[in-house]
Amino acid sequence: MSINCLPAARLMLRPLPPFTIMARRPVIVVAGLACETSTFSASRTEAPAFHPRRGDEVIEKYPFIQPGSPLGEAVDWRGALIGHALPGGIVTRNAFETLSTEIISRLKDITTSVALDGMWLDIHGAMCVEGIDDAEYQLLKHCREVIGPDVLVSVSMDLHGNVSRELAHQTDLITCYRTAPHVDVSETKERACRNLLELINRRNNGEAFRPYKAWIPLPILLPGEQTSTRDEPAAHIYATVTLVEASEGVIDAAIWVGYAWADEPRNRAVVVVTGWDKEAISSGAEKLARIFWNAHKDFKFVAPTGTFTECLDIALRSSKRPFFISDSGDNPTAGGSGDVTWGLTQLLSRSEFTDESGPVVIYASVPGPGAVDKAVEAGVGAIITATVGAEVDHFHAGPLTMTRRVHAIKHGDHHAAIEIVLQVGSVYAIITKLRKPYHLEQDFTELNLTPRSSDIIIVKIGYLEPELYSMAKDWMLALTPGGVDQDLVRLGHKRILRPMWPFDRDFEEPNLSSRIIEMSNEKLTGF
């Protein structure tokens, strides 16, 4: 079986609205917290995991608003606090309150010194917090209590986020990525900022400045591994987004797939279209909702699937190298804890890999802080006995003890802190101080590994990120256990709204009509 190397969804973007530099530059504050969190993961996310940036550090994060850029010159940007954590388990209540309280405090300081025109909220949209539903709405609501109803708010999100009616109400503009894998991250955020500036300019010119918002929820909740925009039907669905956006009277159009590994009532697919023409945004939203719903039974996994054993058997028989296998159930970039040892345990039990002359396999990765410390002390080439994994998630397999040679040591990684490689027969197992995603070729080559000449590469990931996708000569998605198990039904969701596809297979067609959400300075009424 070979990979169907379809290009990423082509972005058909209309020119962004023009903006002007006014005598007094408008003031826009930047804030946000982002963490994609699985409620089925045993791990917990604490405040340091967000790597918070404050003040000028916030502005430095985004090249398109820095001094010298068009937006940087047109706006007086003020940084409050942003924090982007690696996906993981539920955010602790203390972490959320610590960070959100600091955001509120910084907003108070900023609003005391200058009048705000706008706020850009940069979030993911799938953050779950202990004891709190709809955390992003709660965050924005508290921000609104400080900045007031007159400040215009633009929100940028991941398409795997969730948009409740309440969150949509608190915003004036809301958009999300249009590609998965996400190759339009910066573009999306810049669009959110440019459109916000356009609203501010319209207000200063005496024009209507609060757009209408058409919101349609859909009873669909699918994983990213079935909704990649590389493949159909997502490719043509997301191509339609830009066509709707190009319609007269429309500012922005967006489809959120939603986040499948969290058990909250808000979790589902959503369409939002914003603009000046109520009829245009309503019909545009309904067009997107209809095309999405009509295709809901057509979504399939982005690669051939199988059990871990089946994937290994097929990879060994294949002549295509390197052959990639996604150990999908513990994917740390989807919310898995990252320290499930089930896959590595299964791999090392195979006789094909016990000898160093066997097929070369790279496995990425399992955290093992103690093993890392031992390797660092012993040095490259030393033989050590070390135990790794299952410190957080031991439900599927216990800690794994190995006596093997240290192949490589690397210090200073942003996510992992320290990485080591242990050679176990013909398997090169990457062990980390802290969990880390492996998305780039250099993630391997910097560890003295040669992925392009390896036989099999097993990565805790779902769909392959672009560099890995282009490197792979073949690929399978192993349906393995963990906090982001691709078998959604066996996870046991209890709080999502029902019926919901694919949890329920037969139900009446949902209401696909647009709901016009009240403007942010109006009271939210109705259902």
What label would you give each PLM region?
Residues 200-235:
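Internal, active-site/partner-interface "lid" segment
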Residues 225-425, 430-434:
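Hard-cation-handling environments
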Residues 79, 97, 101, 293, ...:
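Extended hydrophobic packing segments that form well-structured cores
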Residues 90-104:
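Glycine-rich anion/phosphate-binding loops
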Residues 29, 33-34, 42, 50, ...:
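Active-site histidine-anchored catalytic micro-motif
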Residues 15, 21-25, 107-117, 311-323, ...:
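Glycine-rich phosphate/diphosphate-binding loops that line cofactor/substrate pockets in enzymes
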Residues 40-44, 91, 131-133, 164-169, ...:
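Short acidic, glycine/serine/threonine-rich loops at helix termini
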Residues 8-9, 13-71:
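N-terminal amphipathic/basic leader segments beginning at the initiator methionine
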